[in-house]
Structure formats: structure tokens, C-alpha cells
Amino acid sequence: MLAGVLLLVEWRVKVHFPGMWALVSFTAAAFLLERSGSNLRFETKGSTSFVVHLAGTVLFGGLWGAVIAGCSTVLSELDQRKSAIKVLFNTSQRIVAVAGSFAIVRLLGAATPMFDFTPGVPLIVTDVQRNSLLYLLFAVLYFAFNTTAVSLVVAWSSGSRFREIWNLTFRG
């Protein structure tokens, strides 16, 4: 439900449609990275698809970054024949991580896209520095949302304490 609310919030922010080619390319890249992931503890899997999720959000904004993350996650989960509840959770968790963290940095003043390369528009150093720091915060929040959601669900489903799962997650 939170994923849907965040998508609706991001939808209300007027951001240009990046085009089907960009969305399909980013979704395919994230899907392929997800497929090449590695197995972790507690029947979880890690991948580098987050790079594409973050890049898509930096370039296209919170809505389209969340769409890329959601679509690539659904495709990957279905390809791996995961149960419906895992597909729903993993997809929602990625959408919340992208849209939620981007909503926070947008409220703090982050620009979309991060840099404006329009001919004739100068890059202002203070804007570049501010946006760089805000997008660094975006990445930190993305991982915080993601790790917290996974740790909570793994702790709940395994009967372990959240703190124990959280510590094991960071130790690898």
C-alpha cells in the first residue's frame, strides 16, 4: 500500500516522460543485473541492479525510477518462479526504497535531472555541489529503506530478532 501511495505522490510531480526506449533499456539492464545476483543468508539474494535503479531515478525522477525498479523486480521475481507473496514484497520494497528516498531528497530541494546539460545553460557550482550531496543522501536512504524492510521481514518470518538480522546483514 505504501508503494502505491508513493507512486501516486511522485505521479503528481510533473516530470517529463523519458520515452519508451529509456524505460525499456533501464528495465532490461536492471533485470539482467538482478538475474546475475549472488545468494546471501536467510534465503535472500543480492544484486547490483540497485545501480540502475539509482541511475534511473537520478536521470528521470522518482516516478520513473520507481517504475524501472518495480518492473525489473517483477520480471526477475517471475523469472525465478518466486511465490506471489515474495513477488509482491520484493517489488513493493524496491518501489518504496526508490520513491520514498527520492521524495525526501526532492523535499530538500534536489533537482531532476541532477544536472541540466541544456545548451546555453551554465552549470552553477553551488547547485552541482548541493545536488551531489542530496543524491548521495538519496543513495543512503535507498539502502536504509531497503535493508530495514528486508531485515524486518526476515526477522518476522524466521522468528529471529530484528537487531540480530540487521547485524548479520551488514557483516555479510
Descriptions of predicted regions:
Residues 1-172:
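Short helix-perturbing small/polar motifs within transmembrane alpha-helices
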